[in-house]
Curated annotation (Swiss-Prot):
Keyword terms, alphabetized: Repressor, Stress response, Transcription, Transcription regulation
Membrane-crossing residue ranges in chain numbering: none
A molecular function GO annotation: DNA binding
Function: Negative regulator of class I heat shock genes (grpE-dnaK-dnaJ and groELS operons). Prevents heat-shock induction of these operons.
UniProt similarity note: Belongs to the HrcA family.
One GO BP annotation of this record: negative regulation of DNA-templated transcription
Pfam family name, one: HrcA_DNA-bdg
Name under which the protein is recorded: Heat-inducible transcription repressor HrcA
Amino acid sequence: MVTERQQDILNLIIDIFTKTHEPVGSKALQESINSSSATIRNDMAELEKQGLLEKAHTSSGRMPSVAGFQYYVKHSLDFDRLAENEVYEIVKAFDQEFFKLEDILQEAANLLTDLSGCTVVALDVEPSRQRLTAFDIVVLGQHTALAVFTLDESRTVTSQFLIPRNFLQEDLLKLKSIIQERFLGHTVLDIHYKIRTEIPQIIQRYFTTTDNVIDLFEHIFKEMFNENIVMAGKVHLLNFANLAAYQFFDQPQKVALEIREGLREDQMQNVRVADGQESCLADLAVISSKFLIPYRGVGILAIIGPVNLDYQQLINQVNVVNRVLTMKLTDFYRYLSSNHYEVH
């Protein structure tokens, strides 16, 4: 059982330690804690007994343990605060013209990695929730073509493929017609289901030779099922993570899955501190926060760093970036949905 004073002491030690990265002694706490040095030392000893503090090898001071950081995140972290002193710089960073969604997400990731010194990941709306709004096939050469998908009237995904040997020009038109008739307006999740259930029967009806046609469907749609992910500051992992964690970030789809699994459907923000699960990120801290992508859904910003982060400062910064990012995205999608020649 942690008393109110002990919690204040733990919070103050974490605040000092995350700024100085030096063990904290009782004298450093006396100005802020209205108690004698002896009382503070007793409380620090009790916090150590509970596993929330640990001794430093090189001094008589104490440092927060992993359990101490976990306790702080659960009981003391304020998720609603804003880094007001940094609002101007964050707004200024977004004061430029962007030509696609990925550029806006990349700017947010770059900004957060510069502020935090950590690795940052930004995720678009979950692929399964995106909707196919346009489709076309562009013939590139005698044997190659390009499938062009538009998701949510804003994101373009392309997939180059070899035209099957037995395909005629009219077969490509059939393929295009089937996709437009059966899939337009449906979510990616619905399309994935239809490819498994409806499409095999439709292929039998429309194609004389069905060899490789279902494989072609799966090939051209494969890219659409992948996460739209941007990263910044991967090199920072070398400062605080092991080689396995660094190499894990060479697999962006697995990184995206790990981040999504750490944030429940009903959560807007979450902080995981060395949660001990079987994961390459198990010994690290992951701060995840959802942000609104107008007209489409929500994306996720995630900061990956060492356990001894200044969590409150990072949450404040993430909150500001989220708000400015949402404003920028609102302008971006409002422009996309407007008549181009009426915009001044």
